[in-house]
Swiss-Prot record:
It is found in: Secreted. Residues 1-23 form the signal peptide. Belongs to the snaclec family. Disulfide bonds join C25-C36, C53-C148, C123-C140. This is Snaclec dabocetin subunit alpha. It comes from the Eukaryota. Expressed by the venom gland. One of its GO terms (molecular function) is toxin activity.
Length: 154
């Protein structure tokens, strides 16, 4: 009986330690604060990258970044995946207005509440020169790796 309780307790500890981690995300995706992320090394235009993300599953988009903690997590993920890359990495922000100012929403519909922009063009990526810690504006037709984001799976 004591051994059964010990094994049951051990399984409970393992289950609880996995909750909120990558266990809730698809294989090879990383988990952070209730979302799943994956850096894709495929080179795509901003629009093709967003289309690729949305084709993975319902509700998935290019990554939105809503806090400095999330920015640091995504930058580390990109740096680890895109080692020795000569490319920037697309995120889910693009200027859709004709007034040359930043859109107020990410591709997943969430509001822009955190930003670190280095200069203006049309689509936004993470700047490889800053180890993906700063945003950079790039021509939307450039081909770059990209980061998809979704809610954790339940």
């Amino acid at each position: 009986m004591g051994r059964f309780i010990s094994v049951s307790f051990g399984l409970l500890v393992v289950f609880l330690s996995l909750s909120g981690t990558g266990a809730d995300c698809p294989s090879e995706w990383s988990s952070h604060e209730g979302h799943c992320y994956k850096v894709f090394k495929l080179l795509k235009t901003w629009e093709d990258a967003e289309k690729f993300c949305t084709q993975q599953a319902n509700g998935w988009h290019l990554a939105s970044i809503e806090s400095v903690e999330e920015a640091n997590f995504v930058a580390q993920l990109a740096s680890e995946t895109l080692t020795k890359s000569k490319y920037h990495a697309w995120i889910g922000l693009r200027d859709q207005s004709k007034r040359q100012q930043c859109s107020s929403h990410w591709t997943d519909g969430s509001a822009v509440s955190y930003e670190t922009v280095t200069k203006y063009t049309k689509c936004f990526g993470l700047n490889k020169e800053t180890k993906y810690h700063e945003w950079i504006t790039l021509p939307c037709g450039d081909k770059n790796p990209f980061i998809c984001k979704s809610w954790v799976l339940h």
